[in-house]
Amino acid sequence: MQVKQIEGVLNAKDIRFALVVGRFNDFIGQKLVEGAIDCICRHGGSEECIAMYRCPGAFELPMVAKKVALSGKYDAIITLGVIIRGSTPHFDVLAAEATKGIAQVALDTMVPIAFGVLTTENIEQAIERAGTKAGNKGFDAAMTAIEMVNLYRQI
């Protein structure tokens, strides 16, 4: 007996995307945005199918993502932001709350939400993950969003 395997494909044609982007550490965040847009366009989507919502920082991402998801205008949401560890416990709290909040929005709304929030020890790691040594996590998050929309459409 052959098990039927169902998975999403990397085809962004006819998918409406919302980018929800934290402005804090924007010089790195903008590289994530560029990576996400590049991925969508390389996989058959277009800039006309993308809307971008900017919020102050990572803590606000779940709130904006939920409002966007509930609008019903988008097939997928890509959250992008940058959290860099400082000398206080603020990093741990912020990273945990942003992560949990974004996951909760996805579960509550059943809209595919891709997590493209960098949580790094230092600025060098953030730069590496925004398009240099370690690829571009914005690009990776967009790939996840494309695949999830196409998977959802088969369920």
Swiss-Prot record:
It catalyses: (2S)-2-hydroxy-3-oxobutyl phosphate + 5-amino-6-(D-ribitylamino)uracil = 6,7-dimethyl-8-(1-D-ribityl)lumazine + phosphate + 2 H2O + H(+). The active site is at 90 (proton donor). GO terms for cellular component: cytosol; riboflavin synthase complex. The keyword Nucleotide-binding does not apply. Its EC number is 2.5.1.78. 5-amino-6-(D-ribitylamino)uracil binds at residues 24, 58-60, 82-84, 115. It comes from the Bacteria. InterPro entries: LS (IPR034964), LS/RS (IPR002180), LS/RS_sf (IPR036467). Pathway: Cofactor biosynthesis; riboflavin biosynthesis; riboflavin from 2-hydroxy-3-oxobutyl phosphate and 5-amino-6-(D-ribitylamino)uracil: step 1/2. GO terms for biological process: riboflavin biosynthetic process. The keyword Transmembrane helix does not apply. (2S)-2-hydroxy-3-oxobutyl phosphate binds at residues 87-88, 129. It holds the Pfam family DMRL_synthase. One of its GO terms (molecular function) is 6,7-dimethyl-8-ribityllumazine synthase activity. Keywords: Riboflavin biosynthesis, Transferase. Catalyzes the formation of 6,7-dimethyl-8-ribityllumazine by condensation of 5-amino-6-(D-ribitylamino)uracil with 3,4-dihydroxy-2-butanone 4-phosphate. This is the penultimate step in the biosynthesis of riboflavin. Belongs to the DMRL synthase family. NCBIfam families: lumazine-synth (TIGR00114), PRK00061.1-4 (NF000812). This is 6,7-dimethyl-8-ribityllumazine synthase. The gene is ribH.
